């Protein structure tokens, strides 16, 4: 279906015809743990990866399969792997690329959970990370070590929406035989397709814009099919016989989808962060309206920014669409259709003023999620990024007077009026 536009693909990929078992137009929920094999030889072929298809519910499910195929198509990748959460997608990706004694180069200004994983949890397993100013390409290059296994970035940094130069970073990664891994949760494939700019692996917390309604946890890894694992020589568990799967070479068994297949067959098999069929079904419902919601999110965000930049109680607004943002040129390059409905601003004063503003809101919900159709607010320094030290907070561009907004799809007049409620409480 590659000849169709995004808005059509988000509705039809993976189920171009009604369900063959029932003629249902909607994707059914296949609530089963396991699948009947036609014969012993058929079972052996499935387990040997010689025959594609369902093996066991922890690894695959037909509802899950439609979701994976659809998001992979929207991103321009060759395969998808859906998991129980965005955190699971990030963790499985890093663990598939780096083993004990190895190293990652990562953007400083990323989601607090990802930063904590890389800075504190993975070092316990022997995987260390150097955090870099992603805009300083010399610093990025200098951070690469002989044991480095990936460069990790976000299309829109969390929470300040800083933007990396994906093309330039892909060139650096590939020159060193490394894949470029990018979290596109805030970008979404509707606004930007990182694989077209050189990224090799794309990650989403599907909990956010893909699901879109604050009902469902999920994550997905998209294999771009662009990285030559055999040529690199740095990932023998993918390109050489793998003893954990009776000597299979995933580059031979799965071709361009070797990375996604390795995670499914080994890491998902062994660690079990599987997605349920019902969750996959809910995420498909969100996917069907992704473009419509993103257009409204962007429209409302533009008007909120116009309001905030002129408000006397606002010290600074951090959004790359603004000309004074250091990444404005990159925003125009990579986001020609707009975007970035999650951003921060600094209120005049400190933590107390920020708290009063937040507590004075009525429509905005104070919670840790983002990218919901409902408008959301939080104080990052004491919540989502509270595990970071003061130095790490400063590196991430988060202050005690920083407030994060996630602009929803309510009527813009009501959103602006509620922001007035917050400022009135200060």
Residue ranges of predicted features:
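N-terminal "arm"/small-domain region of PLP-dependent enzymes with the aminotransferase-like
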Residues: 2-61, 69-70
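Conserved N-terminal alpha-helix of the aminotransferase class I/II PLP-enzyme fold
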Residues: 39-91, 113-121
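Conserved small-domain helix->loop->beta segment predominantly found in fold-type I
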Residues: 271-274, 278-280, 285, 289, ...
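Conserved PLP-enzyme active-site core in the AAT-like
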Residues: 2, 14, 18, 81-310
């Amino acid at each position: 279906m590659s000849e169709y536009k995004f808005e059509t693909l988000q509705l039809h990929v993976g189920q171009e015809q009604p369900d063959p078992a029932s003629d249902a137009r909607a994707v059914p929920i296949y609530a089963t743990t396991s699948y009947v094999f036609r014969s012993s030889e058929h079972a052996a072929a499935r387990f040997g990866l010689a025959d594609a298809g369902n093996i066991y519910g922890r690894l695959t499910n037909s509802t899950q399969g439609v979701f994976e195929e659809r998001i992979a198509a929207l991103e321009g990748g060759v395969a998808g792997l859906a998991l129980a959460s965005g955190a699971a997608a990030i963790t499985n990706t890093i663990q598939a690329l780096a083993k004990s004694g190895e190293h990652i180069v990562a953007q400083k200004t990323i989601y607090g959970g990802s930063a904590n994983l890389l800075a504190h949890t993975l070092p316990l397993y022997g995987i260390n990370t150097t955090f870099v100013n992603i805009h300083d390409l010399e610093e990025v290059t200098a951070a690469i070590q002989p044991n480095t296994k990936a460069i990790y970035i976000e299309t829109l940094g969390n929470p300040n929406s800083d933007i990396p130069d994906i093309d330039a970073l892909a060139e650096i990664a590939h020159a060193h035989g490394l894949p470029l891994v990018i979290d596109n949760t805030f970008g979404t494939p509707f606004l930007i397709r990182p694989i077209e700019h050189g990224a090799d692996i794309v990650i989403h917390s599907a909990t956010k814009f893909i699901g879109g309604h604050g009902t469902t946890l999920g994550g997905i890894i998209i294999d771009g099919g662009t990285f030559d694992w055999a040529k690199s020589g740095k990932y023998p568990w993918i390109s050489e016989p793998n003893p954990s799967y009776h000597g299979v070479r995933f580059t031979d068994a799965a071709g361009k989808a070797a990375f996604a297949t390795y995670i499914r067959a080994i890491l998902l098999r062994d660690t079990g962060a599987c997605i349920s069929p019902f969750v996959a079904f809910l995420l498909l419902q969100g996917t069907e309206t992704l473009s419509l919601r993103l257009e409204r999110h962007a429209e409302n965000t533009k008007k909120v920014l116009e309001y905030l930049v002129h408000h006397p109680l606002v010290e600074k607004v951090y959004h790359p669409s603004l000309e004074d943002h250091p990444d404005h040129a990159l925003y125009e390059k990579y986001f020609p259709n707009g975007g970035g409905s999650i951003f921060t601003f600094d209120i005049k004063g400190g933590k107390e003023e920020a708290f009063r503003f937040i507590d004075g809101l009525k429509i905005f919900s104070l919670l840790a999620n983002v990218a919901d159709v409902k408008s959301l607010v939080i104080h990052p320094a004491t919540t989502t990024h509270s595990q970071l030290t003061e130095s790490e907070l400063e590196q991430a561009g988060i202050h005690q007077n920083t407030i994060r907004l996630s602009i929803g799809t309510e009527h813009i007049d009501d959103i602006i009026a509620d922001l007035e409620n917050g400022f009135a409480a200060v």
